[in-house]
């Protein structure tokens, strides 16, 4: 492979510099992405391997990031289970018949990745061909708690009151669904590795909606089940649970992940102190809003972040997804500042 920095960092092997990529790097901040989006709706892009691969490769070609992540969406799993999904501009994703009672769970069907999710696997296969070993390819999926939250709420939420109400009123049913999702997600990630993904990331996007007790009961065990099942495929596993920085050590222990994502609300040096480079690799964690700053200031803040992580067992990234109105030149300043860094 021409550039294996990312995979070496995942395995905590020596690297010349930290690798860099960005969550949501194939996204609306790129004019080239918007050009594809103008001729196709979001879900068609996700479900059409040729379009998904076209935008997957854009940040590799335009910004020289050290890894590609397949263009897809975490909600393809509930959709594969039979839920009707739409994604509307200005509104975001929405399930048309959310699961508001345990009886609704019977509507869900079992998933065989090579059947209902074949389009994702075909996109991974095609992306590996098109990348031609220039950089590694990352696959991903949503974590059980986050998926269940969307499936019950029907859309994103500030309070997640409906999902949390299910935990309170019907905990046994919630556990049953979370266990089912953990198996489905884990099997999906294994299938992604078999289709060509060289690492996979689990996104528990709404982990921060739960307090410590509920996180430990309803999110962490199933995040761990999915991660450990995925690890059986042999590729590095990354876990990112924003809003749960207080639990970094527990997440590392329960999931056995090779890489733990660090959000922008967690102090970089503190994360490294709590999870030393000898134990696990860390990924993150520049606040995406710093990409609104001048390129000079972006470089300064990025260097501070790199120094805080210490240069070992670290994958440079943002502490959340890149925002859609960030200037491309500012994203490039972030990537270039990592590529040019000479070490602490």
Each model region followed by its residue ranges:
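Short glycine/proline- and acidic residue-enriched helix-loop micro-motifs
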Residues: 41, 102-112, 167-174
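A gly/proline- and charged-residue-enriched helix-loop-helix capping module
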Residues: 90-130
């Amino acid at each position: 492979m021409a550039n294996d920095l990312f995979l070496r960092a995942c395995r905590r092997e020596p690297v010349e510099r930290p690798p860099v990529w960005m969550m949501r790097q194939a996204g609306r901040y790129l004019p080239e992405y918007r050009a594809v989006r103008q001729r196709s709706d979001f879900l068609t892009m996700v479900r059409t391997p040729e379009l998904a691969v076209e935008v997957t490769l854009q940040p590799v070609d335009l910004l020289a990031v050290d890894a590609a992540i397949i263009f897809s969406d975490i909600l393809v799993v509930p959709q594969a289970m039979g839920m009707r999904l739409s994604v509307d501009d200005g509104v975001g994703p929405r399930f048309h018949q959310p699961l508001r009672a345990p009886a609704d769970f019977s509507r869900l069907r079992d998933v065989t990745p090579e059947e209902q999710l074949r389009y994702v696997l075909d996109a991974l296969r095609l992306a590996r061909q098109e990348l031609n070993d220039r950089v590694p390819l990352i696959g991903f999926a949503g974590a059980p708690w986050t998926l269940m939250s969307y499936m019950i709420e029907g859309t994103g939420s500030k309070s997640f009151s409906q999902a949390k109400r299910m935990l309170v009123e019907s905990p046994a049913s919630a556990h049953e669904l979370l266990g089912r999702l953990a198996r489905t997600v884990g099997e999906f990630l294994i299938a992604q590795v078999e289709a060509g993904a060289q690492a996979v990331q689990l996104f528990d996007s709404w982990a921060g909606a739960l307090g410590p007790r509920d996180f430990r009961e309803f999110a962490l065990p199933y995040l761990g089940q999915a991660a450990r099942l995925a690890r059986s495929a042999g590729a590095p596993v990354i876990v990112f649970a924003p809003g749960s920085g207080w639990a970094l050590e527990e997440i590392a222990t329960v999931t056995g992940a090779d890489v733990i994502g660090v959000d922008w609300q967690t102090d970089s040096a503190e994360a490294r102190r709590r999870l030393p480079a000898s134990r696990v690799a860390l990924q993150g964690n520049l606040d995406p809003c710093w990409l609104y700053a001048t390129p000079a200031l972006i470089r300064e803040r990025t260097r501070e972040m790199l120094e805080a992580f210490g240069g070992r067992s670290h994958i440079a990234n943002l502490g959340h997804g890149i925002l859609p109105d960030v200037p491309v030149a500012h994203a490039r300043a972030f990537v270039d500042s990592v590529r040019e860094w000479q070490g602490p």
